[in-house]
Amino acid sequence: MKKRKLEHQREVQDVVAQLRPIDDIMFQRLCENILLIEEVLRVILEDGKIKVKSVIPQSSIQNLHGRSVVLDAYCKLGDGSYCNVEVQRSDSDNHFKRVRYNAACITANVTDPGERFEQVKDLIVVYISEFDVFHGKATIYHTRMRADETGARVPDGYQAIYVNTKNNDGSRIAELMQCFLQTEIDNPNFPILAEELRAEKGNIEGDEAMCKIVEDYAEKRAQERGREERAAGMQDTLIALVKEKLLAPAIAAQKANMSESEFMKLVQG
């Protein structure tokens, strides 16, 4: 019995040793430290005076139909606005619609019935991924709604910021993102992140909560692999149907959550 327990502890230690801030299981633990989230947001939002009043890691909210949305780090800032920070490793869904959906749920959740729209709180969504959702060369992309005809910005109080660890453009934000890929951080520019990661990894023995998180993480990764394999299988089927002229390319591309031009490259390749 004692031997099995020691083996289990070693397995947990091995898994935790490989975890990085970009891994949602570790990010969930790191987000319990408000000062850490503050450090990260000050870099990404390029505002050294930002204050985080509260943060709820792995917060769950529901829409009107009862569907739950789990938010990695749901923050209230010092000026009364809200910020949701998410980390994403899996590239098997429409990320822009995911961000839009989560933002709508957050807005509905923090707005009281009968409240004037002028009083709706500002919201920033920070979406951190291991890949570049824009397939460009930048580390960070700022998006806001604009009028097509004039280019004027729509003052709706909402902004989505997409940050990735893939592109290193030499900026301070890119430096932070490279730390998100490391199992050990030794960068004096981000002392709270470095120290908190060390603390989490050094406090494993006897930590039942961490053991449970590791087990949940293993199960979640297995489920993600299953979804990715199913998505790949569906994509192959759609390509075959288009090649056999049994399905229109536009419809197939829509079902694959891709543009028609991107989908046709797969068909022709």
Residues of each region from the PLM?
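Short, well-ordered beta-strand micro-motif
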Residues: Y127, Y162-N164
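Accessory alpha/beta interaction modules
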Residues: M1-D156, S171
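Low-complexity, glycine/alanine/valine/leucine- and proline-rich hydrophobic stretches
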Residues: A147-D156, N164-K166, L176, F180-I185
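Short, charged alpha-helical interaction segments and adjacent helix-coil junctions
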Residues: K2-A17, P21, I25, C83-Q88, ...
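Selected N-terminal structured segments and early membrane-anchoring regions
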Residues: F117-E118, T165, L197
